[in-house]
Amino acid sequence: MKSNKIASIALLLWVVTIAVFAWFFIRGNTTAGTDGRTAVVLQPAERDLVLTEMRGLLSSTQGILEGANQGDVARIILASRAAGMASAADVNPALMAKLPLEFKSLGMSVHHDMDEIAKAAEGGTPVPEILKMTSKAITKCVACHSAWQLSTGS
């Protein structure tokens, strides 16, 4: 009887622990922002890393647009591949845990979109269609920037 009680307590603690981890995985480390958006609270170095990644996405988008404008498919491929899923592969798990699920989902879907743009360009998809794909990806950037801000918690 005593071992059943201990087993029940252990199981309960396990379930509570999993629930807490799931809550933080979904919610991330957030607080009310200063401008109506939700602030994601990060350490300064983590914030810098996320902003650097965002600038990389913006630079890749510019490269796609320049390539499209010049009819340079190789440039479109190079620019979009630079921002694909491979560029997000080495993100620190501790940082990922601090990011809300929606933020992570939007970010990862933009990286996936960049890979899809590269595949489309490699497959000979016409430039107007590439531009539509790029516009769809940028819509996600706008949605994310409309909902979230990065804070160092100070």
Outline where the language-model segments fall.
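Hydrophobic membrane-insertion alpha-helices, especially the h-region
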Residues: 8-24
